[in-house]
Amino acid sequence: MGSLTRAEEEETAAAEEWSGEAVVYVNGVRRVLPDGLAHLTLLQYLRDIGLPGTKLGCGEGGCGACTVMVSCYDQTTKKTQHFAINACLAPLYSVEGMHIITVEGIGNRQRGLHPIQERLAMAHGSQCGFCTPGFVMSMYALLRSSEQPPTEEQIEDSLAGNLCRCTGYRPIIDAFRVFSKRDDLLYNNSSLKNADGRPICPSTGKPCSCGDQKDINGSESSLLTPTKSYSPCSYNEIDGNAYSEKELIFPPELQLRKVTSLKLNGFNGIRWYRPLKLKQVLHLKACYPNAKLIIGNSEVGVETKFKNAQYKVLISVTHVPELHTLKVKEDGIHIGSSVRLAQLQNFLRKVILERDSHEISSCEAILRQLKWFAGTQIRNVASVGGNICTASPISDLNPLWMATGATFEIIDVNNNIRTIPAKDFFLGYRKVDLKPDEILLSVILPWTRPFEFVKEFKQAHRREDDIALVNAGMRVYIRKVEGDWIISDVSIIYGGVAAVSHRASKTETFLTGKKWDYGLLDKTFDLLKEDVVLAENAPGGMVEFRSSLTLSFFFKFFLHVTHEMNIKGFWKDGLHATNLSAIQSFTRPVGVGTQCYELVRQGTAVGQPVVHTSAMLQVTGEAEYTDDTPTPPNTLHAALVLSTKAHARILSIDASLAKSSPGFAGLFLSKDVPGANHTGPVIHDEEVFASDVVTCVGQIVGLVVADTRDNAKAAANKVNIEYSELPAILSIEEAVKAGSFHPNSKRCLVKGNVEQCFLSGACDRIIEGKVQVGGQEHFYMEPQSTLVWPVDSGNEIHMISSTQAPQKHQKYVANVLGLPQSRVVCKTKRIGGGFGGKETRSAIFAAAASVAAYCLRQPVKLVLDRDIDMMTTGQRHSFLGKYKVGFTDDGKILALDLDVYNNGGHSHDLSLPVLERAMFHSDNVYDIPNVRVNGQVCFTNFPSNTAFRGFGGPQAMLIAENWIQHMATELKRSPEEIKELNFQSEGSVLHYGQLLQNCTIHSVWDELKVSCNFMEARKAVIDFNNNNRWRKRGIAMVPTKFGISFTTKFMNQAGALVQVYTDGTVLVTHGGVEMGQGLHTKVAQVAASSFNIPLSSIFISETSTDKVPNATPTAASASSDLYGAAVLDACQQIMARMEPVASRGNHKSFAELVLACYLERIDLSAHGFYITPDVGFDWVSGKGTPFYYFTYGAAFAEVEIDTLTGDFHTRTVDIVMDLGCSINPAIDIGQIEGGFIQGLGWAALEELKWGDDNHKWIRPGHLFTCGPGSYKIPSVNDIPLNFKVSLLKGVLNPKVIHSSKAVGEPPFFLGSAVLFAIKDAISAARAEEGHFDWFPLDSPATPERIRMACVDSITKKFASVYYRPKLSV
């Protein structure tokens, strides 16, 4: 690393005047950024100054929770620009001279909600609320940057960089849709006067009367003439009157202020430069050859955070005009290296409209590719040059620069400019032909010629905001020679198949000079197979799939060019109509959502679709989560020291470097635990700190505390552990083979006699098969977090935690510290999603933090980074099912013999209860006379897998639906026929002895068949498939039956505390946790209905172990049943006490009645309690009633797949569910939609990749998919185009409070309808090749599995017809 000598420093100071003054406006308030903060991100700064509405969800720009709007003034165009960015990646000093607007700045409950905030809240667009501020700000930035109301497509596109795990996106899209349907003026002016003409204060951005203003240089400056008047949006569906604030204008100071060159510093010797001229950049590069040039920091930010890269000198080139050129010239478009990708998009759109059509083929290809490049926030800051010089092998643009014949202009520190073809620029893995004293100056993109065609290709796990698995840029120039069209020039460049963007040189040579016709294809395919060779263990895996994509892309390119020639009249042999589907990219129309339910109650809070009680807090960023809690004085921050081996003996732990690290306050290991080091929710088989042997990667070995979070993480990384490795079990198959099972985890359920049935001859057919079900990451938006502090010098321990089970935190901490539970208090206000991932796994982090807090007598906060969270906390259990099914030729099921195994990981946790529920649900909704289900929990060297929405039920039902499909294939009948023929009915006896009561599956199924018009849908799909060779559609109907109750009897209990105050308001406390599912809202509705008072009179503050003791975790979908009933019990007690007073007087209000009762000394507080009756199961006898009742549902799905790439779209989803008489139909429908989309992710998108025998390119036991960059949950672009949800009408559930039913988990499995619709489409593709037999499709049905199952001449070059892509299970 170079460094400036004193002489060079003096020379630099003399040459240019560098300033150390950095000014930024935040929500209209002027702030001076002190020197020394170059290491901070904008997000850290915003939260440090008391603006916690902007959230840290991932830290890599992948989730959008940190979205803010940045406004800057362009001195060239004299216009203010507004755009959304990821604050988690933006260096603090990168926004110097800009105006930052956060969610707090646009509206709150005191000033009034902004129309965007209000609309989102009222449309039920917020559940857990952690992602909500990010969505608000993405929409706000779109409106502020729009000259006219945006289209619905633009709205959806603007949300591509925002993730939500709760809602399923439909209500968010519906909330924002209104902003595209009105022509009101949309906040796009930068006037210095407000609507009533009053001046705007430069320091606050709000109306004032401070008179004339002065600019930053002290000279008199009159206010600019306003070009437009402006006022907040006012739409029919929004109460605009509630919003009294005007939009924050761009601060005049920043508009008038002279921009200066900046030189600032940061922690650990970091230097930050912001030059204003190219010569300054070159001078700095001469002094610091290894300095990093940055624009958006989207790559460097990830490297420093997750790869521990250290760059001492950072040069921000955002203000260098020479690097920002965008010019149209005779030889093409000249693009400065610092041009942002969003700028390039807008420029290309304009160029395409203005230039001749034959010139713009390259422009169109790049523009189309940019649509799928990252999310909006990244494109707003990432630069052309940054993407080029990073030289990523999966860059979406580099193959196109190479294919289009682009050239790069490079300048050195002596102002010498050289030009190099893009195809020669990339030398190796992240290596380019750029010397340390050179920088990329610009890109020259040439115009295309007549009959020159350029096309882009990309296939990723997920379309939006995802890196490519394989991408390509292809170009061909053909000329007519003696009546034939001859290839004059061709470029074929692939990404994702080598260490650099890879040129298919043999293929290019062969094609040059050849006649353009179908005869090219076979030889071209053979040469491409030689040109692109992936080793068996190539990084990224999926070798067969990625190889097939190289041929598929060229085939698509050939057909594209041929079709273009044909429609222009230059090609006589046109494409057959069925082949056109290969070149037709799916154009996604705007989605539509429909919700159908009836309101059966009037005049009471129960049954009304009221908005989530925290919605207004969430949309304004005022809702407080654990990491938002103001920290007590002297709070220390913690970071974990984790195992890096799957199974190893610890030989030594060296903390010497950590102890000398800045801010270090302590390292805590197993020897420091005051109480018991072993813990667990059922069996205490897990150590808080590993003492001798580690049994998985990510196991906690120690905990470091320091004065800041960054210092704690830095110190933790310096702890060196020496290991002696031991053999590891890394899959279910390995565990079964080795007999590696958790103790006492074998279970068996028997009904009838399976063996006798198989041997009796009653079964006309017997099938056998194996189903692999992949795991799933919870991906709750709020990471695991806890704040622990001692009270009375450790006599008590209090904590605030993000958990579904405060009582478990209380127990764990008391056990670890050796304290009685009565001295440990855990409080939870709300959590940003849980889904089971915070039921047990969160407690061990609180326990670890409590050791440090107890020993040091100081508060300790622990917040996990997303990658640490994912690699340590466990996921949904992967399953292996082996089935044998006997049935008649008529399709009647006679016998099921099933062995199921789940991957428990390295400790017991909840794996046995998960297995048990899976076994209970192994029949789904089918009546089977003879059943034998054996199950066992596998011990593997992975983090302990844990509870996840459905708790094993979905995995077992997926196995059941697979053997149903297998039966249908054998019988050559539709799966829907077989399902309907075998439905359970009222009075059916299940395979664990429970009598089925109130069975509504027939009603649900029948209503769905009518709603989706199934027979017509089938005819339409057949017709489409007959006319399209390379795109296929498929449909499926899937039923579900989900048992409600904890299968462990004692957990079916609940407590609540209800306190009525003399003003008639009510404080309710219960043992359940609000995590977005609307539990507090429903409970409040129950209380309001009980007292017959407005819902606004009920308040629920938090969940606390010192208010309601021994609370059952918020899980099993039973919380509304349990805590609603407990609250009802408490309310009824109070009402019974009040009744004598009420009967004696005519009280005008509830408040008057309460006051009268108080004056008569009547107790206005009550503890309510409820137990679920008539449940329990005996595993010795194998009989019992594990469930109080069942929730039924069914879903129809229609999909369309691209058989050449594996890409798919969900066209239609129709859901019918029996929820009895809903307490809140809006919240319940939100749960159905969110659950379905989460289930869709599990079934078709989300794949965990572990270092196992199937993925040898990953280090053994390590999780590769440990962040949003590599693990893809559904995005806005993945939701169904037509999404309909209906609640079954006219049904009651007399067993439960207000005849309602549980909803959290039951809809999840319905997402598998998409998987089976995909399989239906694949079957149509296989039939084209003459393959009609059964084939397995493991979950998730990713593009890899879809493509490789659609066997054709291309896939057969790389794999057999029965190839089964590898899966971590």
Curated annotation (Swiss-Prot):
<comment type="function">
    <text>Key enzyme involved in purine catabolism. Catalyzes the oxidation of hypoxanthine to xanthine and the oxidation of xanthine to urate.</text>
</comment>
<feature type="binding site">
    <location>
        <position position="63"/>
    </location>
    <ligand>
        <name>[2Fe-2S] cluster 1</name>
    </ligand>
</feature>
<comment type="subunit">
    <text>Homodimer.</text>
</comment>
<keyword id="KW-0500">Molybdenum</keyword>
<feature type="binding site">
    <location>
        <position position="128"/>
    </location>
    <ligand>
        <name>[2Fe-2S] cluster 2</name>
    </ligand>
</feature>
<keyword id="KW-0560">Oxidoreductase</keyword>
<dbReference type="InterPro" id="IPR037165">
    <property type="entry name" value="AldOxase/xan_DH_Mopterin-bd_sf"/>
</dbReference>
<feature type="binding site">
    <location>
        <position position="440"/>
    </location>
    <ligand>
        <name>FAD</name>
    </ligand>
</feature>
<feature type="domain" description="FAD-binding PCMH-type">
    <location>
        <begin position="265"/>
        <end position="450"/>
    </location>
</feature>
<keyword id="KW-0411">Iron-sulfur</keyword>
<keyword id="KW-0408">Iron</keyword>
<dbReference type="InterPro" id="IPR000674">
    <property type="entry name" value="Ald_Oxase/Xan_DH_a/b"/>
</dbReference>
<feature type="binding site">
    <location>
        <position position="804"/>
    </location>
    <ligand>
        <name>Mo-molybdopterin</name>
    </ligand>
</feature>
<dbReference type="InterPro" id="IPR036856">
    <property type="entry name" value="Ald_Oxase/Xan_DH_a/b_sf"/>
</dbReference>
<dbReference type="InterPro" id="IPR016208">
    <property type="entry name" value="Ald_Oxase/xanthine_DH-like"/>
</dbReference>
<feature type="binding site">
    <location>
        <position position="131"/>
    </location>
    <ligand>
        <name>[2Fe-2S] cluster 2</name>
    </ligand>
</feature>
<feature type="binding site">
    <location>
        <begin position="383"/>
        <end position="387"/>
    </location>
    <ligand>
        <name>FAD</name>
    </ligand>
</feature>
<dbReference type="Pfam" id="PF01315">
    <property type="entry name" value="Ald_Xan_dh_C"/>
</dbReference>
<feature type="binding site">
    <location>
        <position position="917"/>
    </location>
    <ligand>
        <name>substrate</name>
    </ligand>
</feature>
<feature type="domain" description="2Fe-2S ferredoxin-type">
    <location>
        <begin position="20"/>
        <end position="106"/>
    </location>
</feature>
<dbReference type="InterPro" id="IPR006058">
    <property type="entry name" value="2Fe2S_fd_BS"/>
</dbReference>
<dbReference type="InterPro" id="IPR002346">
    <property type="entry name" value="Mopterin_DH_FAD-bd"/>
</dbReference>
<dbReference type="InterPro" id="IPR008274">
    <property type="entry name" value="AldOxase/xan_DH_MoCoBD1"/>
</dbReference>
<comment type="similarity">
    <text>Belongs to the xanthine dehydrogenase family.</text>
</comment>
<dbReference type="InterPro" id="IPR046867">
    <property type="entry name" value="AldOxase/xan_DH_MoCoBD2"/>
</dbReference>
<dbReference type="InterPro" id="IPR036318">
    <property type="entry name" value="FAD-bd_PCMH-like_sf"/>
</dbReference>
<dbReference type="GO" id="GO:0004854">
    <property type="term" value="F:xanthine dehydrogenase activity"/>
</dbReference>
<dbReference type="Pfam" id="PF00111">
    <property type="entry name" value="Fer2"/>
</dbReference>
<dbReference type="GO" id="GO:0016491">
    <property type="term" value="F:oxidoreductase activity"/>
</dbReference>
<dbReference type="Pfam" id="PF01799">
    <property type="entry name" value="Fer2_2"/>
</dbReference>
<dbReference type="InterPro" id="IPR002888">
    <property type="entry name" value="2Fe-2S-bd"/>
</dbReference>
<feature type="binding site">
    <location>
        <position position="839"/>
    </location>
    <ligand>
        <name>substrate</name>
    </ligand>
</feature>
<dbReference type="InterPro" id="IPR001041">
    <property type="entry name" value="2Fe-2S_ferredoxin-type"/>
</dbReference>
<feature type="binding site">
    <location>
        <position position="951"/>
    </location>
    <ligand>
        <name>substrate</name>
    </ligand>
</feature>
<keyword id="KW-0001">2Fe-2S</keyword>
<feature type="active site" description="Proton acceptor">
    <location>
        <position position="1305"/>
    </location>
</feature>
<protein>
    <recommendedName>
        <fullName>Xanthine dehydrogenase</fullName>
        <ecNumber>1.17.1.4</ecNumber>
    </recommendedName>
</protein>
<keyword id="KW-0274">FAD</keyword>
<keyword id="KW-0285">Flavoprotein</keyword>
<dbReference type="GO" id="GO:0005506">
    <property type="term" value="F:iron ion binding"/>
</dbReference>
<feature type="binding site">
    <location>
        <position position="164"/>
    </location>
    <ligand>
        <name>[2Fe-2S] cluster 2</name>
    </ligand>
</feature>
<feature type="binding site">
    <location>
        <position position="1047"/>
    </location>
    <ligand>
        <name>substrate</name>
    </ligand>
</feature>
